[in-house]
From Swiss-Prot:
Family, per entry: Belongs to the RuvA family.
Keywords assigned by UniProt, alphabetized: Cytoplasm, DNA damage, DNA recombination, DNA repair, DNA-binding
Entry function: The RuvA-RuvB-RuvC complex processes Holliday junction (HJ) DNA during genetic recombination and DNA repair, while the RuvA-RuvB complex plays an important role in the rescue of blocked DNA replication forks via replication fork reversal (RFR). RuvA specifically binds to HJ cruciform DNA, conferring on it an open structure. The RuvB hexamer acts as an ATP-dependent pump, pulling dsDNA into and through the RuvAB complex. HJ branch migration allows RuvC to scan DNA until it finds its consensus sequence, where it cleaves and resolves the cruciform DNA.
Species this chain originates from: Bifidobacterium animalis subsp. lactis (strain AD011)
Main location: cytoplasm
Claim: DNA damage is one of the keywords in the record: yes
Region (Domain III) residue spans: 153-207
Name under which the protein is recorded: Holliday junction branch migration complex subunit RuvA
Disulfide bond sites: none
Length: 207
């Protein structure tokens, strides 16, 4: 099972991206917002989910872990496959999608191509109680929304950059650590060393 890729964008279009990982090109189906944010030659870290059918093996990719979790959660609803789940994430950012499910907003969900009103209502019925709205309110990063940068976060990012990490990789690691640990923003000075240590561990693990 391929859970994550780190490599360089070889090509990108409106529905797919090819990422070169040590000379091997992985073709990925991705949400439109993620594809728009990518460009050729860019170094990326992509969270992946593999779908196996009778006709093909498809690798789906996401620029943040929350999008991948939402993608998998949507498929727990009977009748919702990877194509519909991807369509939803191409129409609504994960936080907006979670909020729409929590609020019972079937009109917002049915804007996704391939999903009708009844399908939207079924998703709401089956997932409404399992969507964690607290993660929305704390500003967990998505492909279109990142954790707001404050002085504490800037200190951590600058510290990682001084150790040789690229700014984009450093920022992504800090965002991920803050989201997964539940540390509140703005980042207090006392939490800066903790976040720095956790982010550095995450980056070293991803090498």
């Amino acid at each position: 099972m391929i859970g994550m890729l780190k490599g360089r964008v070889e090509s990108v279009d409106t529905s797919n991206a090819v990422v070169d990982v040590h000379g091997v090109g992985f073709e990925l189906r991705m949400p439109s917002n993620d594809l728009t944010a990518m460009h050729m030659g860019q170094d990326v870290k992509i969270y992946t989910s593999m779908s196996v059918s009778q006709d093909a093996i498809t690798l789906f990719g996401f620029l943040d872990a929350r999008s991948k979790r939402m993608f998998l959660q949507l498929q727990k609803v009977s009748g919702v496959g990877p194509k519909v789940a991807l369509s939803l994430l191409s129409t609504l950012a994960p936080d907006d999608l979670a909020q729409a499910i929590h609020d019972g907003d079937d009109k917002a969900l049915s804007r996704a191509p391939g999903l009708g009103r009844k399908g939207a209502q079924k998703i709401i019925l089956e997932l409404k109680g399992s969507i964690d709205v607290d993660k929305i309110e704390t500003g967990e990063p998505t492909s279109t929304q990142r954790i707001p940068t404050d002085k504490g976060v800037e200190q951590v990012v600058e510290g990682l950059m001084s150790l040789g990490w690229k700014q984009a990789d450093a920022q992504q690691a800090v965002d991920s650590v803050i989201s997964s640990s539940g540390i509140a923003l703005p980042l207090e000075e006392g939490n800066v060393p903790t976040v720095l240590r956790l982010a550095l561990t995450s980056l070293d693990r991803g090498r």
